[in-house]
């Protein structure tokens, strides 16, 4: 490693250890800095050993493991009251973290329910079948309404009940489809219109149909 690269690596690692102010192994530092700074494992090990030899960082040996950390003498002393304030901040942040993790798990569970209920292909097939069934019942209902004495009150009530049931199913499936699409579109790089065109989705609006009022 050239002098310039060695100096750059020393500066990067020293700043990182001082900023983080916590113990690290050479593997930890390599993993955390390699992506952003392109430091090799050998260079990291050598640089940290040199920094420790020069007294710029501290080194502790635990069996075969070496741990490095910032020289604490460079930092100002902290009073008891400041330590209590820091402890309070840690407690508050830990509580917020737990709350955020709980919310995240809940959202992941909701997303899993949405994505596992029906696949896009199954949903589209189901919507198509329901539309066809609704059309048949609408046609049947129209004929019944136009008739005079050909339908008994019981038959008429049955048809109205079926119409109400299938209209509710239509609304329910439409909400389910909307929820699934919204979940998919959160990670989809294009617009909703482009997604619908790519998978061949036709909405009620595309077909100029609306859910009847019941």
UniProtKB/Swiss-Prot annotation:
Pfam families: LZ3wCH, TBPIP. This is Homologous-pairing protein 2 homolog. Residues 115-179 are annotated as: DNA-binding. PANTHER family: HOMOLOGOUS-PAIRING PROTEIN 2 HOMOLOG, TBP-1 INTERACTING PROTEIN. One of its GO terms (molecular function) is double-stranded DNA binding. InterPro entries: Hop2_WH_dom, LZ3wCH, WH-like_DNA-bd_sf, WH_DNA-bd_sf. Residues 79-147 form a coiled coil. The gene is psmc3ip. GO terms for biological process: homologous chromosome pairing at meiosis; meiotic joint molecule formation; meiotic strand invasion involved in reciprocal meiotic recombination. One of its GO terms (cellular component) is condensed nuclear chromosome. The keyword Metal-binding does not apply.
